[in-house]
Amino acid sequence: MAEHEASAEGLGAMSAPLAGEASSVATASAGASGPAAAIACVVEGPGAAPGAAARLSHRLGVPLEHGLAQVDQGASALLVDGQGVSLVRDGMRLKGDFERMARRIRPDALGRELLVRAARIKGGSGGLTAVDATAGLGEDALLLAAAGFSVTLCERDPVIAALLRDSLDRAAASAVLARAVERMRLVEGDSVDVLHRLDASPDVVLLDPMFPGGKRAAAKKKLQLIQTLEAPCDDEGKLVAAAMAAGPRKVVIKRPAKGPWLAGIEPDYSLCGKAVRYDCLVAPRYGRHRGAC
């Protein structure tokens, strides 16, 4: 599979669809952090692609092993097998999977998604753009893309970015997901840096920084593995300031339902669900209104 590299300069164009490209993903180096300690790339099992594993190992600058038995107990590894790329550690396994979201992006369900409602732009139609500044495994970005946004996904951790890139590439072959995935572009690097480099203002910036609070049982495995790579946001104010400085019409901040405001900044209004809350900051020129859950 061809991999398309895009310069970190001129990122304003990066929300455009990837029409006619062989891969669904464009990547850019924008100061991504190095891989976590004790990470190895492992190729194993029928259907595994040794060439893909070797390229991933080289890209991340980590050892390439043949079989999980070669990985030290307690160490994390990126497993490349016939199912794609997974992060494994101590019997836990994390793999991006957009297929399980197929029902949520159906037209009859998409409009009920709280994120889609929060990101809605009054009077907006086609050509809307968004930056998911804390992409993670890309589920929120997929919802926005399915809703018609061209989405730039920022992910600073190269291991999580590798999982996300694999998810996007696999989803590009899905009849259900391909149309949305064509509107998603991945940029590896610090989101504050990427937001500062944008040539054009997006309509929406989405923020969902790692939250250091308690873990729900359903999310525990995912959080445990991700938190071995990414720490909670260490400068919330800087992140919000960069998002606002990018000049969007709206900044949407995903928070735990009962969590505090990000950086202590009161939103213009919020949309609340049982588990999460979306706090919305509206640019003054587009009119603000106050509302709460």
Name every feature range the model reports, one short phrase each:
Residues 3-4, 15, 35-39, 221, ...:
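SAM/dcSAM-binding transferase cores
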Residues 190-194, 231-244:
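A short, acidic, amphipathic alpha-helical segment used as a generic capping/interface helix at domain edges
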Residues 150-155:
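Conserved SAM-binding motif I beta-strand of class I
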Residues 2-5, 14-18, 26-128, 156-201, 293:
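S-adenosyl-L-methionine
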Residues 236-282:
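Conserved Class I SAM-dependent methyltransferase catalytic core
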